[in-house]
UniProtKB/Swiss-Prot annotation:
This is GlcNAc-binding protein A. InterPro entries: Cellulose/chitin-bd_N (IPR004302), GbpA_2 (IPR041029), GbpA_D3 (IPR054063), GlcNAc-bd_A (IPR020879), GlcNAc_Chitin_IntDeg (IPR051024), Ig_E-set (IPR014756). One of its GO terms (cellular component) is extracellular region. Its main location: secreted. Pfam families: GbpA_2, GbpA_D3, LPMO_10. Residues 437-478 form the Chitin-binding type-3 domain.
Length: 485
């Protein structure tokens, strides 16, 4: 007989809700950072210009999860897999050409790098590497491309950093396009997080005198004949239609994303005096079959440019409702089974995969679903070991294009024999400030945990309802503070 969940199951709409965040962090530029990481720009627009990376694959939904083996450069990700950290989720990041990724301006000398954490692990250190002056940007990233002496090392001192942290570093002299590799070595696992940062030296100001970056044409999707793509140009008063450039999709060739991006950039350069579009080549703006930055003339009074679409055929909406997933399942003699109910909105292919914390797949299911269909699904796990697990859902349209991906977290726990009074000192978190080395508590999973000796005993008191990483038995880092009795 299968084990029943210990807690009441809850329903979650995957299109808008994700589970508890167990991992982990990415290079950002929210407050002080000089440049965002490659993976960050897959999900978030660049600060100041609105530029984004495209065609990143599933990692665009989880930029915090570029995690791989630690020990770089002696060990760590293989050459050619450095940007992805050998994660299949991030494989698209390993593509490397001179014009593939958005580049952020930077200058040599003192600069600030910023990390944003979704789970702020105990940290060993952060290291920053940069490509050699003569590196080849059209070859996969390898150790030979980098100066393997880090230009900046920040000690983590085996403590948790805040959810956002800044590092002051001295960036070496370079010219043109370079890649910075930021490595966050966490202290409580055998893994590190790898973020590459695409930068261009020589300027935080305008790329040409009198021209300022103001937007980007991102070839994010194919269009259909009859659709229109256009610029939305803004001044101090808001959108100014007088500066709009429209491109009607009137041929099969123009339906392809890279084709209409090139054509729209070309039309801007032909028809607008205060706007230019394309990659900078010397003193010229050259449209490309890919992402085209947009620039505005200094003194024009124009502030920014966005891209709009007039779609003749409305785009379908997709969502998947999953109910029946519990927060905890107790391990027993029979395999663990997840009894789920799915409800589809839109014609889709729904995929479910269960992973343990080490990313090993334990169960999977996929099937086409029609709009409004209800389906009962049972996933039987191939193994059951106590700890954190994830249910990953993917929604694809009938052409196989990924529409959404979400991750929900749950725990597998060992069966517990109820302890007798006197076997423990407190019911956690009662008496929190009295916890010292050797204190025994009864945790929410029904087990007894003993506070570790110094220097780890201080973690036992580090708990609030909003910071539960050291909560005995269920926190993401409980083993740093407690021994299970």
């Amino acid at each position: 007989m299968k084990k029943q969940p210990k807690m009441t199951a809850i329903a979650l709409i995957l299109s808008g809700i994700s589970g508890l965040a167990y991992g982990h962090g990415y290079v950002s530029a929210v407050e002080n950072g000089v440049a965002e990481g490659r993976v960050t720009l897959c999900k978030f627009a660049a600060n100041g210009t609105g530029e984004k990376n495209t065609h990143c694959g599933a990692i665009q939904y989880e930029p915090q999860s570029v995690e791989g083996p630690d020990g770089f450069p002696v060990t760590g990700p293989r050459d050619g897999k450095i940007a992805s950290a050998e994660s299949a989720l991030a494989a698209a990041l390993d593509e490397q050409t001179a014009d593939r990724w958005v580049k952020r301006p930077i200058q040599a000398g003192p600069q600030t790098f910023e990390w944003t954490f979704t789970a702020n692990h105990v940290t060993k250190d952060w290291k920053y590497y940069i490509t050699k002056p003569n590196w080849n940007p059209n070859q996969p990233l390898s150790r030979d491309a980098f100066d393997l002496n880090p230009f900046c090392v920040v000690e983590g001192n085996m403590v948790q950093p805040p959810k956002r942290v800044s590092h002051e570093c001295i960036v070496p002299e370079r010219e043109g396009y370079q890649v910075i590799l930021a490595v966050w070595d966490v202290g409580d696992t055998a893994a590190s997080f790898y973020n590459v940062i695409d930068v261009k030296f020589d300027g935080n100001g305008p790329v040409l005198p009198d021209w300022n970056p103001a937007g980007q044409i991102i070839p994010s999707m194919d269009l259909s004949i009859g659709d229109t793509v256009y610029t939305r140009v803004f001044d101090n008063e808001g959108e100014n239609p007088a500066y709009r450039t429209e491109l009607k999709i009137d041929s099969e060739t123009l339906t392809k994303a890279n084709q209409w991006s090139y054509a729209l950039a070309t039309k801007i350069n032909q028809t607008q005096k205060q706007q230019r579009a394309g990659q900078l080549n010397g003193d010229q703006f050259v449209p490309v079959y890919g992402t085209n930055p947009i620039y505005l003339k200094e003194g024009s009074g124009l502030k920014s440019v966005e891209i709009g679409y007039q779609i003749e055929a409305p785009q379908p909406e997709y969502s998947l409702t999953v109910s029946g997933l519990a927060k905890e399942y107790e391990i027993g003699e029979q395999p663990i089974q997840l009894d789920l109910t799915l409800e589809a909105q839109g014609e889709m292919s729904a995929e479910l995969t269960v992973y343990n914390h080490h990313q090993k797949p334990l169960a999977s299911w996929s099937q086409a679903m029609t709009d409004g269909e209800l389906k009962s699904v049972t996933l039987e796990l191939s193994e059951a070991k106590a700890g954190h697990h994830m249910l990953v859902s993917r929604i694809k349209d009938r052409d196989g294009n990924l529409q959404d991906q979400q991750t929900l977290d749950f725990m597998l726990v060992e069966p517990q024999t109820p302890p007798t009074p006197g076997d423990y000192d407190f019911v956690f978190p009662n008496g929190l400030k009295e916890y010292v080395a050797g204190t025994k508590v009864l945790a929410s999973d029904g087990a007894i945990y003993q506070c570790k000796p110094w220097p780890y005993s201080g973690y036992c008191q580090q708990w609030t309802s909003n910071a539960t990483q050291y909560q005995p038995g269920t926190g993401s880092h409980w083993e740093m503070a407690w021994d299970k009795r």
